[in-house]
């Protein structure tokens, strides 16, 4: 093999190695929406000095995305949060966090904040396929039953690494 041939071979090999080690294409932002159907599994109330009530709740349920390709579709989800309620029972402040576990055992986590009508949420992180997830969106309360069941609608964006 000539010197020129060896040089071309080495450069071609280096190019293949560079491409193999280069990070993948830039992550793409995707949209998704759906519902969170839940049941309140724990709740406690604490009267506050100004007549408001602090309610701490744990809710468990399932995420149903409108598009089955959404990575969080059909994830078992648990949320823990606090709600400040007026004497009229109107929720003025709602905040907390949720974690979802998919069929593969990968976990995503979000924060949320709003009032009884809805609010904002955002991804905090995750494991496995959700490691490095970014994004967020909005939610709204759709239905609440007196036995602790409910449905919240959500929409937002996500970017996976």
Model regions: which residues?
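Bacterial N-terminal signal peptides
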Residues: 11-20
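Glycine-centered signal
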Residues: 2, 24-25
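Generic N-terminal simple sequence motifs
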Residues: 19-22, 67
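General helical secondary-structure elements
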Residues: 1-2, 52
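Bacterial N-terminal signal peptides that target proteins for export
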Residues: 2-11
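Beta-strand-enriched cores of mature, soluble protein domains
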Residues: 26-161
């Amino acid at each position: 093999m000539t010197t020129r041939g060896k040089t071309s071979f080495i450069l071609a090999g280096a190019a293949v190695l560079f491409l193999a080690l280069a990070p993948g294409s830039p992550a793409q932002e995707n949209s998704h929406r759906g519902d969170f159907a839940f049941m309140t599994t724990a709740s406690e109330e604490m009267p506050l000095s100004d007549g408001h009530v602090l309610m701490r709740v744990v809710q468990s349920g399932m995420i149903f995305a409108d598009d089955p390709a959404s990575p969080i579709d059909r994830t078992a989800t648990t949320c823990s949060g606090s709600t400040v309620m007026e004497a009229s029972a109107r929720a003025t402040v709602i905040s907390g966090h949720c974690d979802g576990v998919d069929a593969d055992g990968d976990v995503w986590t979000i924060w949320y904040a709003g009032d009884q009508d809805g609010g904002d949420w955002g991804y905090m992180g995750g494991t496995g396929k959700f490691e490095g997830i970014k994004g967020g969106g909005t939610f709204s309360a759709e239905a609440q039953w007196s036995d602790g069941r409910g449905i919240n609608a959500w929409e937002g964006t996500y970017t996976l690494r």
